[in-house]
Amino acid sequence: MLFLLSPAKSLDYDTPLPPGLAHTLPPFIHESTQLIEVLREKSPQELASLMGISDALAGLNAARYAAWSPRFTAANARQALFAFNGDVYEGLDARSLDGDGLRWAQDHVAILSGLYGVLRPLDRMQPYRLEMGTRLATGAGANLYRFWGKRIAEHLNQRLAADATPVVVNLASQEYFKSVDTAALKARVIECVFEDWKGGRYKIISFHAKRARGLMARYAIQHRVVAPRQLEGFDLEGYAFDASASAQDRLVFRRKDAG
């Protein structure tokens, strides 16, 4: 079973890492290098327009692309699970996981990425900004979905090859999950939906839903979840499985009071 996460825009390369933290390298360094070469051709102004970001952010990322190297070291990179710093990753709270938990996560969590394709939790990554929905034209086509093609699905298939009944639990946004060619994916896909009570009904509230995706990943790591039925036990921060609102491959978790 694999749990898919989106990356985060916010990054943390300052907080000291846990001592003795293991590291691995991303599987698609060659492809990332190709994308960096395309990005380096663009001015900060072009990046601002392409990505819909401020001039200051465009300048920062132009500098990141210029500094990017196909050699990943402790000086220029850090493990993905500790580099991303957003709502999802606050819910996951990697720093509180023990070594066994991190090793389990390494085998069962996959972070989708516009620049890196897929990252394992302990894969080193250099800082970047490149959302999967960016219309960055390459030799493969008009956007990153065309660039990545079937690569991400095939990578996930390889990671699931030893499973008798391969399952992907999608905790990523639709923007990122769209990068997985489901026609090429040889696995059942289960979507987890998190709803909060507001205005007299249950609805998806972005901030809470993002955090809940991280909480679900944390729950899976802590409980070593390897079967879909185990997901129904998720109960962190007041959420509970609602069978009446769920379908076989769409599990709905609801919370009455966010507190």
UniProtKB/Swiss-Prot annotation:
The cross-references to Pfam families, in alphabetical order and at most eight, read:
H2O2_YaaD
Highest taxon, organism lineage? Bacteria
The cross-references to InterPro entries, in alphabetical order and at most eight, read: YaaA
**From its record, what is one biological process in GO terms?**
response to hydroperoxide
Write down any Gene Ontology CC term: cytosol
Q: Which family does it belong to?
A: Belongs to the UPF0246 family.
PANTHER family the record matches? PEROXIDE STRESS RESISTANCE PROTEIN YAAA, PEROXIDE STRESS RESPONSE PROTEIN YAAA
Q: What is this protein called?
A: UPF0246 protein Aave_1172
- Give the source species: Paracidovorax citrulli (strain AAC00-1) (Acidovorax citrulli)
The organism's taxonomy opens as: Bacteria, Pseudomonadati, Pseudomonadota, Betaproteobacteria, Burkholderiales
